[in-house]
């Protein structure tokens, strides 16, 4: 439904503009509207957008519940796109709860499934989630490879909303290396 999409997208815009409380309020409105309309695709869209917003707010508990609900809904209705994204977000939440290996594997599985749907919108952001988990587990080389892929993909597709964050992550990983090159990390 167009209203659910507009509210969901607006929640992200508000977050990026620096209005976290308004973003959450609008996201809740999108979820309520989707539930009231009882349209599976609208519900899946609202749940996914809410998951991303809650990830930005670092609310893994919400995502653990919501990602499972989204995965079940997506499976029931054949929404492969949302099934893949539920895996990514659920993997991030699992990693935040301390299950880093399972979280990384689940994010990777979700990213592969997402790629297989033929879409790539948002992929730089999702790759950033994987890189963060890799960095937390000391897999710095893999984190840097994933971050380079995310940055290149964002530039190639002109999807640059997350580029500054990806660059920040790159610097952080470079500084965490045992033989850190501070000059390279600052670039």
Describe the residue ranges of each PLM region.
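Short, flexible, glycine-rich and Lys/Arg-enriched loop motifs at helix boundaries
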Residues: 1-2
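Helix-coil-helix junctions within alpha-helical repeat/solenoid scaffolds
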Residues: 7, 11-187
